[in-house]
Regions:
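C-terminal binding/interaction regions
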Residues: 2-13, 19-22, 26-27, 32-131
Length: 131
C-alpha cells in the first residue's frame, strides 16, 4: 500500500469524494488522514478523519449504515481521493441517501429515465440481502 503519491494538505488531510459504485451518484465529501486512508484500504470500509472530533470516523460505526469500498481512486494531482462504495443505507446523517440533497440552482433539469440507474436498481434487488 504505497501512499507516497497522495498529497496531504498542511493539516495532514486529503478530501474524499464518496461515490455510489452502482449509480455514480456522489454521496458525500469527507476528509481522510494517512491512518484513515490506510484503514480504508486494509478493511475496505469507509474510514475518514473527523475534523470536528479530531479522530477517526468509521462510517456506520454508530448508525449501521456502512459503505463497502470497492475502489479507491487518486486524482491527477494527487490531492483528492474518490471512494467508490456499495452503501448499506443512507450516506447522510439526516437520513437522506446523499448529503447533496439541497438544490441551490432553481429549476434544475429533470433527467427523466436514466437506464444506468434503473439497471443498477434492478441488479441490486436481485442480490440476496446482506446477513
Amino acid at each position: 500500500m504505497d501512499l507516497s503519491a497522495v498529497r496531504f494538505d498542511e493539516k495532514g488531510l486529503v478530501p474524499v469524494v464518496v461515490q455510489d459504485a452502482r449509480t455514480g451518484e456522489v454521496l458525500t465529501l469527507a476528509y481522510a488522514n494517512r491512518e484513515a486512508l490506510e484503514e480504508t484500504l486494509r478493511t475496505r470500509r469507509s474510514t475518514f478523519f473527523s475534523r470536528s472530533r479530531q479522530a477517526l470516523w468509521r462510517k456506520g460505526e454508530t448508525s449501521g449504515h456502512t459503505q463497502e469500498v470497492v475502489e479507491v481512486l487518486l486524482d491527477c494531482d494527487g490531492d483528492a481521493v474518490v471512494y467508490r462504495v456499495l452503501p448499506q443505507g443512507p450516506a447522510c446523517h439526516t437520513g437522506e441517501r446523499t448529503c447533496f440533497h439541497r438544490a441551490l440552482l432553481e429549476g434544475a433539469k429533470d433527467l427523466g429515465f436514466v437506464p444506468r440507474q434503473v439497471y443498477a436498481t434492478i441488479t441490486a434487488r436481485l442480490r440476496p440481502p446482506p446477513e
